[in-house]
UniProtKB/Swiss-Prot annotation:
EC number(s) reported in the record: 3.6.4.12
SUPFAM superfamilies registered for this protein in UniProt: P-loop containing nucleoside triphosphate hydrolases
Residues bound to ATP: D183, E184, M185, G186, L187, G188, K189, T190
GO cellular component: nucleoplasm; nucleus; protein-containing complex
First-listed, main subcellular location of the protein, grouped into a coarse class: nucleus
Subunit structure as annotated in this protein's UniProt entry: Homohexamer. Interacts (via N-terminus) with RAD51. Interacts with NAP1L1. Interacts with BRD9; this interaction orchestrates RAD51-RAD54 complex formation.
Protein name, per record: DNA repair and recombination protein RAD54-like
């Protein structure tokens, strides 16, 4: 072969008449041979077959590319951003990067030996012989809570997280994956559940995530709160999907995108949705499986026949956590529904539960029960608690005494005014509601009578229109009102409770910088509060069912600000009793009682919670000798039942028989406190306390363990003392107790 055609020489030549390297190679186009220069000897030689076009540029000329075409081509690339090939994908690209498969020995996600590490699972110890026999790719690893969370968890919260994890991973009850978080308000149930979700989404003993998706179902007013709490504690490590509005198609599209996520591609692994929205769109959520469902305010599921319960029960998941600070609200059968939802079958069927547990326990709790009934009731109670305690964790608010200032609760009995008394007696004579209350069953008319009497106890202005229209029970009652009376202007002196409230607000405003929360079950009563505040020139804000969720958050944030001039926060217990944090105030007035103690407890827990720095004062106003005291007594009966089953307190006294609770429509004008009369208190003589409460008593104790006062001298609240001075005839009796003894120098 001629040397000039050798590959080593061919690559160095400059072909003639060529404009670019895209033309075909022709062996005849060669140039005369030149002697190598020293620089040419350093050029890398390459081999090029004569039967294909060269792979490298054969000339020193630049490639023939049109610059405008090049720029246009680059722009076309940049104008088409990468799109994730997942149907209906809405989230970000995520923070997970591609990488190599983990090599070496399997290890826990976080160091179990680190200081204050919270270890949820520890592999069983293995001998050296066992370690050689087992496959290293199948060795279980420690499950350790992320240090970003474990360092902020309090001791009771660490215990709670471990309990929850053991329940949902079927380590406490084999074959069952549910539990009830029944801690009282203020103990951090939300943080514990966020820690559980984050741990399950990131790790397991098998060195992979336990779940890939979780759903949080809550009241609509708490959807935004859950979203904020996830962001607060996880700091952007995860992007939850909160459904708080939108059209049906938009919500369906978001839910389909959530359900279509798989494995490591889950960019939004937490869905936060309201009960109402969940029920309406459950068809989309049933199309796939979910690793975990958390139901906040889970006592909504007390009735297994309602649509919300059935919709949630149809969700394809075995891991279920139910959050409820008050799992028993009305009866044990509702309690059964909650336990059955999280762990189906552990208490049998509803019929079996009622026969074996509910009837014997309730019969044994009745004040008129025989000794045999009591023994059987206690035996069945022990059996029930032994079963349920394996999947229910309950801590009371006395734990908070280590972290929060003192709380003083006061039940203030107020005397009816002469106008209220005459209206009350006339209604009982005319409407005769007691005759319609047969066998403890309430008819529609008796329920209406209860509402009328409750409103009358708040203020006669609330039943003035009924008097004008001469409705049943108020015929001729208009003559009892003062001459020239108008419901447009509020007259506090016509209501015993409103008069006491007027004094409490005035004394608080003049003697301190404290703020006050006013709570009522009726928006009409909130209207009266507004009139009172305008008359006294108090700045106020109001939250009821008409306010949007977004506006609620802004109103609460503004009120809690130390620079806010607002003095009063008016709250409808029906609309906003759950989840609100009103630590800007340290005094709360519960103006009227609810049949359900859980509603009142929720509302009263708004000020005594994390972040509160001042001593808290809770006032529960009751009209003495009226239906309000009967409602309060019914609450005590329910709370005693709850204490027996959930708190396991065996010394809760049996004060009220079911027969006594039927005496709703009796007015006792002479009684200072019908509730105290029924206690048969041994520490009081002629309604005056002569011995203090037992040692260790606090706000969670039975009323028999509270202080009982018929004058101001035993009170610990200077504001109530001054109000009692001003309204000497309006206040008849006060129960009061504190949450704990203040530990000076330790805070």
């Amino acid at each position: 072969m001629r040397r000039s055609l050798a590959p080593s020489q061919l690559a160095k030549r400059k072909p003639e008449g060529r404009s670019c390297d895209d033309e075909d190679w022709q062996p005849g186009l060669v140039t005369p041979r030149k002697r190598k220069s020293s620089s040419e000897t350093q050029i890398q030689e390459c081999f090029l077959s004569p039967f294909r076009k060269p792979l490298s540029q054969l000339t020193n000329q630049p490639p023939c590319l049109d610059s405008s075409q090049h720029e246009a081509f680059i722009r076309s690339i940049l104008s088409k951003p990468f799109k994730v090939p997942i149907p209906n994908y809405q989230g970000p690209l995520g923070s997970r990067a591609l990488g190599l498969k983990r090599a070496g020995v399997r290890r826990a996600l976080h160091d179990p030996l680190e200081k204050d590490a919270l270890v949820l699972y520890e592999p069983p110890p293995l001998s050296a012989h066992d370690q050689l026999k087992l496959d290293k790719e199948k060795l279980p690893v420690h499950v350790v809570v992320d240090p970003i969370l474990s360092k902020v968890l309090r001791p009771h919260q660490r215990e709670g997280v471990k309990f929850l994890w053991e329940c949902v991973t079927s380590r406490r009850i084999p074959g069952s994956h549910g539990c009830i978080m029944a801690d009282e308000m203020g103990l951090g149930k939300t943080l514990q559940c966020i820690t559980l979700m984050w741990t399950l989404l990131r790790q397991s003993p098998e060195c992979k995530p336990e779940i890939d998706k979780a759903v949080v179902v809550s009241p609509s007013s708490l959807v935004k709160n859950w979203y904020n709490e996830v962001g607060k504690w996880l700091g952007g490590r995860i992007q939850p999907l909160a459904i708080d509005g939108g059209s049906k198609d938009e919500i369906d599209q978001k839910l389909e995108g959530f359900m279509n996520q798989r494995g490591a591609r889950v960019s939004s692994p937490i869905l936060i949705i309201s009960y109402e929205t969940f029920r309406l769109h459950v068809g989309v959520l049933q199309k796939g499986s979910v690793g975990l469902v958390i139901c906040d305010e889970g006592h909504r599921l007390k009735n297994s026949e309602n649509q919300t319960y059935q919709a949630l029960d149809s969700l394809n998941t075995s891991r279920r956590v139910l959050i409820s600070g008050t799992p028993i609200q009305n009866d044990l059968l509702e309690y059964f529904s909650l336990v059955h939802f999280v762990n189906s079958g552990i208490l049998g069927t509803a019929h079996e539960f009622k026969k074996h547990f509910e009837l014997p326990i309730l019969k044994g709790r009745d004040a008129a029960a025989s000794e045999a009934d009591r023994q059987l009731g206690e035996e069945r109670l022990r059996e029930l608690t032994s079963i349920v305690n394996r999947c229910l964790i309950r801590r009371t608010s006395d734990i908070l005494s280590k972290y929060l200032p003192v709380k003083i609760e006061q039940v203030v009995c107020c005397r009816l005014t002469p106008l209220q008394t005459e209206l009350y007696k006339r209604f009982l004579r005319q409407a005769k509601p007691a005759e319609e209350l047969l066998e403890g069953k309430m008819s529609v008319s008796s329920l209406s009578s209860i509402t009328s009497l409750k409103k009358l106890c708040n203020h006669p202005a609330l039943i003035y229109d009924k008097c004008v229209e001469e409705e049943d029970g108020f015929v001729g009652a208009l003559d009892l009102f003062p001459p020239g009376y108008s419901s447009k202007a509020l007259e506090p002196q016509l209501s015993g409770k409103m008069l006491v409230l007027d004094y409490i607000l005035a004394v608080t405003r003049s003697r301190s910088s404290d703020k006050v929360v006013l709570v009522s079950n009726y928006t009409q009563t909130l209207d009266l509060f507004e009139k009172l505040c305008r008359a006294r020139r108090y700045l106020y804000v109001r939250l009821d069912g008409t306010m949007s969720i977004k506006k609620r958050a802004k109103v609460v944030e503004r009120f809690n600000s130390p620079s806010s001039p607002d003095f009063v926060f008016m709250l409808s217990s029906k609309a906003g009793g759950c989840g609100l944090n009103l630590i800007g105030a340290n005094r709360l007035v519960m103006f009227d009682p609810d049949w359900n103690p859980a509603n009142d407890e929720q509302a009263m827990a708004r000020v005594w919670r994390d972040g509160q720095k001042k001593t808290c004062y809770i006032y529960r106003l009751l009209s003495a000798g009226t239906i309000e005291e009967k409602i309060f007594q019914r609450q005590s009966h329910k709370k005693a039942l709850s204490s027996c089953v959930v708190d396991e307190e065996q010394d809760v006294e049996r004060h009220f028989s079911l027969g006594e609770l039927k005496e709703l429509f009796i007015l006792d004008e002479a009684s200072l406190s019908d509730t105290h009369d029924r206690l048969h208190c041994r520490r009081c003589v002629n309604s005056r306390q002569i011995r203090p409460p037992p040692d260790g008593s606090d706000c969670t104790s039975d009323l028999a363990g509270w202080n009982h006062c018929t004058d101001k001298w035993g009170l610990r609240d200077e504001v109530l003392q001054a109000a009692w001075d001003a309204a000497s005839t309006a206040i008849t009796f006060v129960f009061h107790q504190r949450s704990h003894e203040e530990q000076r120098g330790l805070r």
